[in-house]
Amino acid sequence: MRTIKKNNEYKIQRYISRGAGRWVHLYDYGSGISPTLECLNELKSIGYKIVATTPHEKYIKLSELPLDCPMALVFGTEMDGISSEVIDNADYFVKIPMYGFTESYNISVAVALTLQSIRNRLENENISFDLSKEEQIKLKIKWATKIIRDGDKIEQEIRRRLMEKTK
């Protein structure tokens, strides 16, 4: 998960969702001239399409969003929506259907609705979205080093010993 800190600090609450925040890898962008552009450019450089949620721009329905490549979903704030930097750099704009008088969902609701819609499509269209075995192993190693005391040192020692064995 990538967070862009402009006006507010983002901090995972330790006790929410029974500690699920420990298993989310956070990339923080909050310093520099343009943290938003830094984040978007980094994502694009590793093959991600930028998908911005908005009720105003030209948009496609979530059901029409191409699912053939990695995507980064961008959600704006309830007050201001997405920034002009996101508008200028997004590959797609999607609109979350809303009914009634307001044009805004709480951010957690917007994320949940969007992810559920995409997940349903992936399953219904039999699109594989699982991590590869190699990606799973790398992630498990990363998690293990987080929960074991001196996990980084232990990982380095294991890697050193494995390298010695292969010589």
What kind of region is each of these model predictions?
Residues 81-87:
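SF2 helicase motor core recognition
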Residues 87-132:
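Structured adenosyl-cofactor binding patch, chiefly the S-adenosyl-L-methionine
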Residues 66-67, 86:
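Structural alpha-helical scaffold elements that stabilize or flank donor/cofactor-binding regions
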Residues 70:
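Conserved catalytic motifs of the protein kinase core domain
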Residues 2, 30, 77, 94-101:
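Short beta->alpha connector loops at strand-helix junctions that form conserved
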Residues 1-58, 115-167:
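RNA substrate-binding interface of SAM-dependent RNA methyltransferases
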